[in-house]
């Protein structure tokens, strides 16, 4: 929403990233979120709900258009915070790109964006998910998923971020959601801060290898439901994952995206 104070201000120029072409990019449309998930990298670094300068809708849309045209961006990932707090902006912005993706916690409903992807974060069966994301969140997300029109053309994925805390629930999670009106399920692994020790991360990546094997087993059992590929999952094994990321993320493919 544009306030009266900013309505007549000139639009700011988009950041100059040079002449490099980027096929994909991501944008955090807000740092604000209605949840406080224990594994969230935003909450680890800061309080995202603290008032800060916010780019108004008109400026953000103008900058997204400029960056798209300048860098040849075809795919845009909309993140937060919780991006659906700025639903009007996101629904308008996603149509600027050939391929759009929204990552949401699902508590504001599932947006209808035919031809685009909506990834809904859900971190295990109800008790394990709610221990991470907050009491009642699992049921809110379930209600949102079942309230949507499954024939509207929106690609809807559930994504479980696997931690040491919720790893015991992988199989139960898949069995619980396998008949939901979704396109599929994806798995990612929690990325700890440097030298982090606690209940979420494995101190030794070799301890995580049995969990990777369990996810691969779910892929083999439900090949159409679980969208993570076996090849991608095998990259998570301790004897090869650092080859693809580097010790400090220097080899990460995300570096090829415009941030």
Regions found by a protein language model. Name each.
Residues 1-6, 116, 121, 127-258:
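Radical SAM enzyme [4Fe-4S]-AdoMet core and its adjacent flexible, acidic
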Residues 26, 46-49, 126-130, 155:
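A short, mixed-charge helix-start or loop-turn motif at secondary-structure junctions
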Residues 1-112:
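Conserved alpha-helical substructure of the radical SAM core
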């Amino acid at each position: 929403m544009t306030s009266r104070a900013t309505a007549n201000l000139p639009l700011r120029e988009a950041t100059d990233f040079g002449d490099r072409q980027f096929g994909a990019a991501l944008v955090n449309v807000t740092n604000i979120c209605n949840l406080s998930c224990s594994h969230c990298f935003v909450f680890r670094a800061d309080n995202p709900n603290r008032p800060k300068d916010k780019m108004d809708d008109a400026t953000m849309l103008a900058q997204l258009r400029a960056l798209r045209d300048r860098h040849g961006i075809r795919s845009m990932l909309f993140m937060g915070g919780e991006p659906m707090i700025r639903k009007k902006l996101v629904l308008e912005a996603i149509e600027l790109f050939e391929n759009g993706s929204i990552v949401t916690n699902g508590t504001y409903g599932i947006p209808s964006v035919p031809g685009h992807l909506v990834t809904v974060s859900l971190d295990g069966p109800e008790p394990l998910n709610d221990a991470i994301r907050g009491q009642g969140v699992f049921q809110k997300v379930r209600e949102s998923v079942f309230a949507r029109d499954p024939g509207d053309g929106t690609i809807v994925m559930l994504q479980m971020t696997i931690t040491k805390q919720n790893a015991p629930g992988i199989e139960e999670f898949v069995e619980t959601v396998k008949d939901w009106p979704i396109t599929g399920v994806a798995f990612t692994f929690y990325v700890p801060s440097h030298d982090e020790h606690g209940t979420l991360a494995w101190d030794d990546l070799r301890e995580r290898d049995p969990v990777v094997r369990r996810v691969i087993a779910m892929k083999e059992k439900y090949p159409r439901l679980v969208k993570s590929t076996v090849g991608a999952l095998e990259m998570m094994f301790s004897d090869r994952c650092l080859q693809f990321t580097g010790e400090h993320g220097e080899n990460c493919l995300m570096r090829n995206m415009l941030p």
